[in-house]
UniProtKB/Swiss-Prot annotation:
The keyword Iron does not apply. It is found in: Cell membrane. It comes from Rickettsia prowazekii (strain Madrid E). Its EC number is 7.1.1.-. It is an enzyme of class 7 (translocase). This is NADH-quinone oxidoreductase subunit M. It comes from the Bacteria. It catalyses: a quinone + NADH + 5 H(+)(in) = a quinol + NAD(+) + 4 H(+)(out). The keyword Translocase applies. InterPro entries: NADH_Q_OxRdtase_chainM/4, NADH_UbQ_OxRdtase, ND/Mrp_TM.
Length: 491
């Protein structure tokens, strides 16, 4: 294995590209074109580096690999301490993959401030990879919260008519959670004098149990907002509806996963006793989210809003899997996060192609699109069927394992949560029928042409992954199997 600081390279490559674009390219069309070349090269190289990490990853080792540790601010315990384990590695790959997809997808759809748009995406890629690889809790916090800035700008500048409201709502919700998280970190450091996760795991017992419960709730709120869980969910539909297409892809595909990842990386291992005590409340909230969000999705008239509420429901399966404290449930939750990242990204890209042609997201304005766009209709069908959990697609594996995990803990809860699959089938099949099938009622649809090459290049890899994950789930599950076992040692 090459002795390269591969994690640092992966984190800082997009950041260096951001600095290069900002420092050397002026605001003109030529600069936009050069920025595209730099962003494409950067995202390709970053993706290659994450694939290298995945190939060289030793699945028989349940500890962190490719570890790097450098002192940053020793007086406050801040170190650049990064590495990957079986849980983190796929989120790192997913981040680089979706960023590349988004940059390709935005080449022909973003018309203003192209250079700045690409800068925001590269910056977000760097910050997300940093968050997924951090082993220092303060470093994780800095990456976790800094992601707010580029996403806020993407929604606020390139979003729809109500973009300012949606961006501000997103900012305030996330900032609200970050305050609790920061206060919890300060208290932990005052007692343990370290932000290193491995040190905190060893010394967390020095903190009184009552204080641990308060810390648990403080950190839980931050991750629940990001997931998002009910009642912290209302920012998501507005953000999705107003965000540009590729902004929605990053939001659903990566940012929502930071909440679930935070539960696995921080909340459960640091506070196992409090997690077990409060798990039942999280499970109840998750089941409510699944049923409530599914019913609300059924009533939506906006395509993106429907998919946004479906995301809340799907992330409900993630949280019930995590807080089942079973190996199969947590494995299902991780798989569900990866699967949802791919499915939701493909759905938002598909909606984006429709919006580029008709400039509306209103379901009633469509109908009969499959007559003019058979390739898109096929992609949409596969993504839709996976979203409702059809066997042999990726959506089935994650939901089934999560439900199986909670079934071992609470049978009634499992059956109620399973109703969400039925409701999901109802609203997704209804959406497909009203948009794709039937006669063409809108004369503008008669002039539609099927997917352009760049659209196929953006969507097709996601569709292939949906099928691959569904047919070969063990190739994914086996990678994080030992890490999940290691996580459950304290339970």
């Amino acid at each position: 294995m090459l002795e390269l600081p591969i994690i640092s390279i992966t984190i800082f490559l997009p950041l260096i590209s951001v600095l290069y674009i900002l420092l050397f390219f002026n605001q003109n069309k030529k600069a936009d074109k050069l920025s595209i070349y730099v962003a494409m090269l950067s995202s390709v190289l970053t993706f290659i580096s994450t694939i290298y990490i995945l190939i060289e990853f030793d699945v028989s080792n349940n500890t962190y690999q490719f570890v790097e540790r450098y002192t940053w601010l020793d007086k406050i315990g801040l170190e650049f301490h990064v590495g990957v384990d079986g849980i983190a590695i796929f989120f790192v790959v997913l981040t680089s993959f979706l960023t590349l997809i988004c940059i390709i997808g935005s080449l022909f759809t973003i018309k203003k401030y192209i250079k700045e748009y690409l800068v925001c995406f590269l910056l977000m890629e760097s910050l997300c990879i940093g968050a997924f690889t951090s082993i220092n809790l303060l470093l994780f916090y800095l990456f976790f919260e800094a992601i707010l800035v580029p996403m806020y700008i993407i929604i606020g500048v390139w979003g729809g008519d109500n973009r300012i409201y949606a961006a501000l709502k997103f900012f305030l919700y996330t900032f609200f959670g970050s305050v609790f998280f920061l206060l919890a970190l300060i208290y932990i450091y005052s007692k343990i004098h370290s932000f290193d996760l491995t040190n905190i795991l060893e010394l967390i017992g020095n903190i009184p149990l009552f204080a641990q419960k308060i810390l648990w709730w403080a950190i839980f709120i931050a991750f629940a907002i990001k997931t998002p869980m009910i009642p912290f969910h209302t920012w998501l539909p507005d953000a999705h509806v107003q965000a540009p297409t590729t902004g929605s892809v990053i939001l659903a595909g990566i940012l929502l996963k930071l909440g679930g990842y935070g539960f696995l990386r921080v909340l459960l291992p640091l506070f196992p006793n409090a997690s077990q005590e409060f798990a039942i409340y999280v499970i109840y909230l998750s089941v409510i989210a699944i049923i409530y969000a599914s019913l609300v999705a059924l009533a939506q008239k906006d395509i993106k809003q429907m998919i946004a509420y479906s995301s809340i429901a799907h992330m409900g399966y993630v949280t019930i899997g995590i807080f089942s404290f079973t190996e199969i449930g947590i494995s299902g939750a991780i798989f569900q996060m990866l699967s949802h990242g791919i499915i939701s990204s493909s759905l938002f890209l598909i909606v984006g192609t429709l919006y580029e042609r008709l400039h509306t997201k209103e379901i009633a304005k469509y109908g009969g699109v499959a007559n003019k766009m058979p390739i898109l209709a096929t992609f949409f069908m596969i993504a839709m069927l996976s979203s409702i959990g059809l066997p042999s697609t990726s959506g089935f594996i994650g939901e089934f394992l999560s439900l199986l995990g909670i079934y071992k803990v609470n049978v009634v809860t499992a059956f109620i949560a399973a109703l969400g699959i039925i409701l999901g089938a109802v609203y997704m099949l209804k959406l497909y029928k009203e948009v794709m099938l039937g006669e063409i009622t809108n004369t503008e649809i008669k002039h539609f042409r099927d997917l352009y090459k760049y659209e196929i290049i953006s969507i097709a890899p996601l569709i292939l992954l949906i099928i691959y994950f569904g047919l070969m789930p063990n190739s994914i599950l086996n990678v994080f199997h030992l890490s999940v076992e290691n996580l459950l040692i304290k339970f």
